[in-house]
Swiss-Prot record:
Entry's family note: Belongs to the cyclotide family. Moebius subfamily.
One Gene Ontology term from the biological process aspect of the record: defense response
Free-text comment about domains: The presence of a 'disulfide through disulfide knot' structurally defines this protein as a knottin.
InterPro entries reported for this sequence: Cyclotide, Cyclotide_moebius_CS, Cyclotide_sf
Protein's UniProt name: Cyclotide mobo-A
Domain of life according to the entry: Eukaryota
Post-translational modification: This is a cyclic peptide.
Keywords: Disulfide bond, Plant defense
Cyclopeptide (Gly-Asn) cross-link site: 1-29
Pfam families according to UniProt: Cyclotide
SUPFAM superfamilies: Cyclotides
Amino acid sequence: GFPTCGETCTLGTCNTPGCTCSWPICTRN
């Protein structure tokens, strides 16, 4: 749930392991 991935997912996918898309940013926990 925290935006600690430093990645955006405007296309709906995250490349960082363990991160999920909470549009428009990738989050972890």
